[in-house]
Amino acid sequence: MTTNMLPLHPYWPRHLRLDNFVPNDLPTWHILVGLFSFSGVLIVITWLLSSRVSVVPLGTGRRLALCWFAVCTFIHLVIEGWFSFYHEILLEDQAFLSQLWKEYSKGDSRYILSDGFIVCMESVTACLWGPLSLWVVIAFLRHQPFRFVLQLVVSVGQIYGDVLYFLTELRDGFQHGELGHPLYFWFYFVIMNAIWLVIPGILVFDAIKHLTNAQSMLDNKVMKIKSKHN
Protein backbone atom coordinates (compact mmCIF):
# COMPACT_ATOMS: atom_id res chain seq x y z
CA MET A 1 0.00 0.00 0.00
CA THR A 2 1.51 3.32 -1.04
CA THR A 3 1.53 6.32 1.27
CA ASN A 4 -0.99 8.27 -0.84
CA MET A 5 -3.63 5.54 -0.68
CA LEU A 6 -6.37 5.75 1.93
CA PRO A 7 -6.41 2.77 4.30
CA LEU A 8 -9.31 0.37 3.82
CA HIS A 9 -10.10 0.27 7.53
CA PRO A 10 -11.17 2.73 10.28
CA TYR A 11 -8.32 2.05 12.70
CA TRP A 12 -5.34 4.02 13.98
CA PRO A 13 -2.50 4.48 13.25
CA ARG A 14 -3.79 5.03 9.74
CA HIS A 15 -0.79 3.34 8.13
CA LEU A 16 -1.77 -0.06 9.57
CA ARG A 17 -2.02 -2.80 6.98
CA LEU A 18 -4.89 -5.12 7.88
CA ASP A 19 -5.28 -7.53 4.99
CA ASN A 20 -7.80 -9.76 6.78
CA PHE A 21 -10.13 -6.93 7.79
CA VAL A 22 -13.83 -7.49 7.05
CA PRO A 23 -16.05 -4.45 7.81
CA ASN A 24 -18.92 -4.94 10.25
CA ASP A 25 -22.26 -5.67 8.64
CA LEU A 26 -24.06 -4.41 11.75
CA PRO A 27 -24.46 -0.64 12.23
CA THR A 28 -22.92 0.98 15.31
CA TRP A 29 -26.30 1.70 16.88
CA HIS A 30 -27.30 -1.95 16.58
CA ILE A 31 -24.18 -3.10 18.41
CA LEU A 32 -24.48 -0.51 21.18
CA VAL A 33 -28.22 -1.04 21.67
CA GLY A 34 -27.66 -4.79 21.87
CA LEU A 35 -24.91 -4.42 24.47
CA PHE A 36 -26.69 -1.91 26.69
CA SER A 37 -30.07 -3.62 26.37
CA PHE A 38 -28.71 -6.93 27.60
CA SER A 39 -26.85 -5.17 30.41
CA GLY A 40 -30.05 -3.35 31.35
CA VAL A 41 -32.05 -6.57 31.47
CA LEU A 42 -29.34 -8.13 33.64
CA ILE A 43 -29.50 -5.17 36.03
CA VAL A 44 -33.29 -5.47 36.34
CA ILE A 45 -33.10 -9.22 36.98
CA THR A 46 -30.38 -8.80 39.61
CA TRP A 47 -32.28 -5.97 41.28
CA LEU A 48 -35.40 -8.13 41.58
CA LEU A 49 -33.49 -11.21 42.75
CA SER A 50 -31.62 -9.21 45.39
CA SER A 51 -34.90 -8.53 47.19
CA ARG A 52 -36.34 -12.04 46.85
CA VAL A 53 -33.37 -14.39 47.16
CA SER A 54 -31.18 -12.66 49.74
CA VAL A 55 -31.23 -14.33 53.17
CA VAL A 56 -31.20 -10.89 54.84
CA PRO A 57 -32.74 -7.61 53.62
CA LEU A 58 -30.33 -5.52 51.53
CA GLY A 59 -30.34 -1.75 51.27
CA THR A 60 -30.60 0.16 48.01
CA GLY A 61 -26.87 0.82 47.80
CA ARG A 62 -26.00 -2.83 48.34
CA ARG A 63 -28.51 -3.97 45.74
CA LEU A 64 -27.04 -1.52 43.23
CA ALA A 65 -23.58 -2.89 44.02
CA LEU A 66 -24.81 -6.40 43.26
CA CYS A 67 -26.22 -5.15 39.95
CA TRP A 68 -22.77 -3.78 39.18
CA PHE A 69 -21.07 -7.09 39.94
CA ALA A 70 -23.65 -8.96 37.86
CA VAL A 71 -22.84 -6.75 34.87
CA CYS A 72 -19.13 -7.25 35.59
CA THR A 73 -19.68 -11.00 35.49
CA PHE A 74 -21.26 -10.73 32.04
CA ILE A 75 -18.65 -8.33 30.65
CA HIS A 76 -15.63 -10.12 32.10
CA LEU A 77 -16.71 -13.69 31.41
CA VAL A 78 -18.59 -13.34 28.13
CA ILE A 79 -17.33 -10.25 26.30
CA GLU A 80 -13.72 -10.22 27.48
CA GLY A 81 -13.66 -14.01 27.53
CA TRP A 82 -14.64 -13.94 23.85
CA PHE A 83 -11.75 -11.62 23.11
CA SER A 84 -9.33 -13.89 24.98
CA PHE A 85 -10.33 -16.87 22.84
CA TYR A 86 -10.85 -15.19 19.46
CA HIS A 87 -8.58 -12.13 19.38
CA GLU A 88 -6.56 -13.58 16.50
CA ILE A 89 -9.57 -13.78 14.16
CA LEU A 90 -11.54 -10.67 15.19
CA LEU A 91 -10.66 -8.81 11.99
CA GLU A 92 -12.36 -11.34 9.74
CA ASP A 93 -15.05 -12.74 12.04
CA GLN A 94 -18.65 -11.50 11.86
CA ALA A 95 -20.08 -12.93 15.08
CA PHE A 96 -21.86 -10.28 17.16
CA LEU A 97 -19.17 -10.16 19.86
CA SER A 98 -16.41 -9.99 17.27
CA GLN A 99 -18.17 -7.07 15.61
CA LEU A 100 -18.53 -5.46 19.04
CA TRP A 101 -14.76 -5.68 19.53
CA LYS A 102 -14.10 -4.37 16.02
CA GLU A 103 -16.33 -1.42 16.82
CA TYR A 104 -14.62 -0.76 20.15
CA SER A 105 -11.21 -1.05 18.46
CA LYS A 106 -11.96 2.17 16.60
CA GLY A 107 -11.08 3.79 19.92
CA ASP A 108 -8.21 1.42 20.73
CA SER A 109 -6.76 -0.63 17.89
CA ARG A 110 -4.61 -2.68 20.25
CA TYR A 111 -7.51 -5.12 20.39
CA ILE A 112 -7.54 -5.98 16.71
CA LEU A 113 -3.71 -6.06 16.75
CA SER A 114 -3.63 -8.71 19.51
CA ASP A 115 -1.37 -6.47 21.57
CA GLY A 116 0.53 -8.57 24.13
CA PHE A 117 -0.48 -6.52 27.16
CA ILE A 118 -4.12 -6.36 26.10
CA VAL A 119 -4.36 -10.12 25.51
CA CYS A 120 -2.78 -10.93 28.88
CA MET A 121 -4.80 -8.32 30.76
CA GLU A 122 -8.12 -9.38 29.24
CA SER A 123 -7.36 -13.07 29.78
CA VAL A 124 -6.62 -12.50 33.47
CA THR A 125 -9.76 -10.39 33.75
CA ALA A 126 -11.91 -13.09 32.15
CA CYS A 127 -10.42 -15.94 34.20
CA LEU A 128 -10.28 -14.18 37.58
CA TRP A 129 -12.55 -11.16 37.88
CA GLY A 130 -15.39 -12.75 35.93
CA PRO A 131 -15.95 -15.77 38.21
CA LEU A 132 -15.08 -13.76 41.33
CA SER A 133 -17.64 -11.08 40.40
CA LEU A 134 -20.29 -13.80 40.29
CA TRP A 135 -19.02 -15.08 43.63
CA VAL A 136 -19.43 -11.59 45.11
CA VAL A 137 -23.11 -11.59 44.10
CA ILE A 138 -23.67 -15.04 45.61
CA ALA A 139 -21.71 -14.16 48.76
CA PHE A 140 -23.89 -11.14 49.49
CA LEU A 141 -27.13 -12.94 48.69
CA ARG A 142 -26.12 -15.77 51.04
CA HIS A 143 -24.68 -13.35 53.63
CA GLN A 144 -21.32 -15.15 53.62
CA PRO A 145 -18.73 -13.72 56.06
CA PHE A 146 -16.02 -13.21 53.42
CA ARG A 147 -18.25 -11.13 51.12
CA PHE A 148 -16.44 -7.84 51.71
CA VAL A 149 -13.06 -9.50 51.24
CA LEU A 150 -14.21 -10.66 47.81
CA GLN A 151 -15.55 -7.21 47.01
CA LEU A 152 -12.21 -5.66 47.97
CA VAL A 153 -10.13 -8.15 45.96
CA VAL A 154 -12.21 -7.82 42.78
CA SER A 155 -12.43 -4.03 42.97
CA VAL A 156 -8.69 -3.57 43.57
CA GLY A 157 -7.96 -5.95 40.69
CA GLN A 158 -10.25 -4.00 38.37
CA ILE A 159 -8.63 -0.69 39.31
CA TYR A 160 -5.13 -2.11 38.86
CA GLY A 161 -5.90 -3.45 35.39
CA ASP A 162 -7.61 -0.22 34.34
CA VAL A 163 -4.72 1.95 35.53
CA LEU A 164 -2.28 -0.17 33.53
CA TYR A 165 -4.62 -0.01 30.53
CA PHE A 166 -4.62 3.79 30.53
CA LEU A 167 -0.93 4.19 31.36
CA THR A 168 0.29 1.85 28.62
CA GLU A 169 -1.66 3.80 26.01
CA LEU A 170 -0.44 7.09 27.48
CA ARG A 171 3.12 5.82 27.19
CA ASP A 172 2.44 4.96 23.53
CA GLY A 173 1.24 8.50 22.89
CA PHE A 174 -2.45 7.64 22.33
CA GLN A 175 -1.57 6.39 18.85
CA HIS A 176 -4.15 3.61 18.70
CA GLY A 177 -7.20 5.83 18.29
CA GLU A 178 -8.28 9.21 16.99
CA LEU A 179 -7.39 11.50 19.88
CA GLY A 180 -10.33 13.72 20.85
CA HIS A 181 -12.98 11.92 18.79
CA PRO A 182 -16.29 12.31 20.70
CA LEU A 183 -17.41 8.69 20.27
CA TYR A 184 -14.27 6.64 19.77
CA PHE A 185 -11.91 8.44 22.16
CA TRP A 186 -14.10 10.11 24.78
CA PHE A 187 -16.90 7.54 25.02
CA TYR A 188 -15.30 4.22 24.08
CA PHE A 189 -11.80 4.77 25.42
CA VAL A 190 -12.20 7.27 28.28
CA ILE A 191 -15.71 7.05 29.72
CA MET A 192 -16.33 3.33 29.29
CA ASN A 193 -13.05 2.53 31.01
CA ALA A 194 -13.15 5.30 33.63
CA ILE A 195 -16.27 3.62 35.01
CA TRP A 196 -13.95 0.81 36.16
CA LEU A 197 -12.00 3.33 38.21
CA VAL A 198 -14.90 5.23 39.78
CA ILE A 199 -17.27 2.45 40.85
CA PRO A 200 -14.59 0.00 42.05
CA GLY A 201 -12.97 2.91 43.88
CA ILE A 202 -16.20 3.51 45.80
CA LEU A 203 -16.52 -0.21 46.50
CA VAL A 204 -12.94 -0.41 47.78
CA PHE A 205 -13.66 2.25 50.40
CA ASP A 206 -16.96 0.55 51.22
CA ALA A 207 -15.22 -2.79 51.80
CA ILE A 208 -12.45 -1.19 53.86
CA LYS A 209 -15.04 0.53 56.05
CA HIS A 210 -16.91 -2.69 56.78
CA LEU A 211 -13.76 -4.75 57.31
CA THR A 212 -12.32 -2.08 59.62
CA ASN A 213 -15.53 -1.97 61.65
CA ALA A 214 -15.55 -5.76 61.92
CA GLN A 215 -11.93 -5.79 63.08
CA SER A 216 -12.65 -3.05 65.63
CA MET A 217 -15.58 -5.02 67.04
CA LEU A 218 -13.41 -8.13 67.28
CA ASP A 219 -10.62 -6.19 68.99
CA ASN A 220 -13.07 -4.72 71.51
CA LYS A 221 -14.47 -8.17 72.22
CA VAL A 222 -10.98 -9.57 72.79
CA MET A 223 -10.09 -6.68 75.08
CA LYS A 224 -13.24 -7.25 77.16
CA ILE A 225 -12.45 -10.95 77.51
CA LYS A 226 -8.88 -10.18 78.59
CA SER A 227 -10.05 -7.57 81.08
CA LYS A 228 -12.43 -10.09 82.68
CA HIS A 229 -9.63 -12.63 83.04
CA ASN A 230 -7.42 -10.01 84.68
Swiss-Prot record:
InterPro entries (UniProt xref): EBP, EXPERA
Gene Ontology MF annotations: C-8 sterol isomerase activity; cholestenol delta-isomerase activity; cholesterol-5,6-oxide hydrolase activity; identical protein binding; steroid Delta-isomerase activity
Domain EXPERA: 61-204
Tissue: Expressed in liver.
UniProt membrane topology term: Multi-pass membrane protein
Keyword NAD: no
Location within or outside the cell: Endoplasmic reticulum membrane; Nucleus envelope; Cytoplasmic vesicle
EC number: 5.3.3.5, 3.3.2.11
One Pfam family named in its UniProt record: EBP
Activity control note: Enzymatic activity is induced by 25-hydroxycholesterol, cholestyramine and lovastatin.
PROSITE patterns registered for this protein in UniProt: EXPERA
GO cellular component terms given for this protein: cytoplasmic vesicle; endoplasmic reticulum; endoplasmic reticulum membrane; nuclear envelope; nuclear membrane
Transmembrane segments: 29-49, 66-86, 121-141, 185-205
UniProt record similarity statement: Belongs to the EBP family.
Primary role: Isomerase that catalyzes the conversion of Delta(8)-sterols to their corresponding Delta(7)-isomers. Component of the microsomal antiestrogen binding site (AEBS), a multiproteic complex at the ER membrane that consists of an association between EBP and 7-dehydrocholesterol reductase/DHCR7. This complex is responsible for cholesterol-5,6-epoxide hydrolase (ChEH) activity, which consists in the hydration of cholesterol-5,6-epoxides (5,6-EC) into cholestane-3beta,5alpha,6beta-triol (CT). The precise role of each component of this complex has not been described yet.
PANTHER family named among the record's database cross-references: 3-BETA-HYDROXYSTEROID-DELTA(8),DELTA(7)-ISOMERASE, STEROL ISOMERASE
Name of protein: 3-beta-hydroxysteroid-Delta(8),Delta(7)-isomerase
Record gene name: Ebp
